[in-house]
């Protein structure tokens, strides 16, 4: 019940920030949020001052530390970039990925090894959905979670002799010294309403962009060239030295989720041709920070998206959620439901069997990121 109330409050605040007040009550709430925004800004300035005056010093490790972060709250497409860089850099280096493990049981001060590069050592509830998904896709690359990234980096160096550490969501994490800061900018909603949390979606003032070495504008294929240039011009106002890349995602595979007959001891991933999506009527389901991008990728792949069900980011699926999805599919006479890799790792064998029992195909759309820039980003990082 508490979780439901929290989700409703979160949804109300997000809609209020995006759409503006509609009542006196809304105006009062925004006034309170504005006061909290000023307090938050003061805390950011104080924290930055402590580090600038060397009163607090970041920890250092021998490995090169590459941070992939953002300046706004919510999904900006960091995870596909982390996977892309990890695969590229692992071709020539010993790479370890470190993440906080948001909403995981291991989200604590002490680091936890999710994957040693050969085996996944935890389950999805302990690792968190994004980290567990990365572990399934990054064979050969260890993953560590922990809120204290310095401790996690030391573990990466000690246990895996890491040469490169990729810090997932590390732009505002000052405890660990970085060699490279990559900042993702969401092409669909780049600058968080221009206001700080909780009045807007900015994690820190836009002046913080001057710390970036590289900018990657995600979902560049979903916006016009004029809008893209506007974003680049704004970035240039705060940082003229950072190199800007455009990131696009493309659907690269389709998987059907099934279960072994009788004992159902394992989940089966059957590869399907992407062509099956062309003209297919589907229901799209996801719990992402920015679901619009997923729906657009489906449409670009040729699917006819009849209905969408969007849950909160990092949503923990319950039996009634699956009942809702199945009932909607039956009402619309749709026999294909498509979700994301991030969501699929939270589906149990019993959950998947529910779809099979109702003759509904459950598919996962796999995407990969491509970068457009003057030089290959991974090659540049290798030279740091």
Curated annotation (Swiss-Prot):
One of its GO terms (cellular component) is plasma membrane. It comes from Halothermothrix orenii (strain H 168 / OCM 544 / DSM 9562). The keyword RNA-binding does not apply. Belongs to the LpxK family. It catalyses: a lipid A disaccharide + ATP = a lipid IVA + ADP + H(+). Coiled coil: none annotated. This is Tetraacyldisaccharide 4'-kinase. One of its GO terms (biological process) is lipopolysaccharide core region biosynthetic process. Keywords: ATP-binding, Kinase, Lipid A biosynthesis, Lipid biosynthesis, Lipid metabolism, Nucleotide-binding, Transferase. PANTHER family: TETRAACYLDISACCHARIDE 4'-KINASE, TETRAACYLDISACCHARIDE 4'-KINASE, MITOCHONDRIAL-RELATED.
């Amino acid at each position: 019940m508490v979780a439901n109330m929290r989700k409703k409050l979160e949804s109300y605040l997000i809609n209020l920030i995006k759409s503006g007040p509609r009542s006196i009550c809304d105006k009062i709430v925004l006034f309170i949020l504005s006061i909290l925004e000023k307090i938050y800004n003061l805390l950011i300035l104080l924290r930055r001052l402590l580090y600038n005056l060397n009163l607090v010093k970041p920890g250092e490790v021998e490995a090169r530390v590459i941070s992939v972060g953002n300046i706004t709250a919510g999904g900006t497409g960091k995870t596909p970039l982390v996977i892309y860089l990890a695969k590229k850099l692992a071709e020539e280096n010993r790479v370890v990925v470190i993440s906080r493990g948001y909403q995981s049981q291991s989200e604590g001060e002490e680091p936890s090894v999710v994957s040693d590069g050969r085996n996944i050592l935890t389950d999805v509830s302990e690792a968190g959905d994004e980290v567990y998904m990365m572990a399934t896709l990054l064979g050969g690359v260890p993953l560590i979670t922990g809120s204290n990234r310095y401790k996690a980096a030391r573990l990466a160096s000690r246990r895996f002799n890491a040469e490169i550490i990729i810090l997932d969501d590390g732009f505002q994490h000052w405890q660990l010294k970085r060699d490279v800061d990559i900042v993702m900018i969401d092409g669909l909603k780049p600058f968080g309403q221009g206001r700080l949390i909780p009045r807007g979606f900015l994690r820190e003032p836009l002046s913080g962009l001057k710390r970036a070495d590289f900018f990657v504008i995600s979902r560049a294929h979903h916006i016009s060239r004029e809008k893209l240039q506007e974003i680049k011009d704004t970035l240039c106002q705060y940082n003229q030295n950072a190199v800007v890349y455009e990131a696009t995602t493309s659907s690269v595979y389709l998987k059907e989720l099934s279960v072994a007959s009788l004992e159902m001891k394992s989940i089966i991933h059957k590869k399907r041709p992407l062509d099956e999506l062309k003209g297919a009527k589907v229901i799209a389901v996801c719990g992402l920070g920015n679901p619009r991008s997923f729906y657009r990728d489906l449409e670009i792949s040729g699917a006819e998206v009849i209905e969408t069900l969007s849950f909160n980011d990092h949503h923990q699926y319950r039996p009634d959620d699956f009942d809702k999805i199945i009932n909607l599919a039956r009402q619309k006479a749709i026999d294909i439901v498509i979700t994301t890799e991030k969501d699929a790792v939270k589906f149990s064998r019993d959950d998947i069997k529910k779809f099979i029992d109702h003759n509904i195909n459950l598919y996962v759309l796999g995407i990969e990121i491509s970068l457009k820039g003057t030089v290959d980003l991974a090659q540049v990082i290798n030279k740091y």
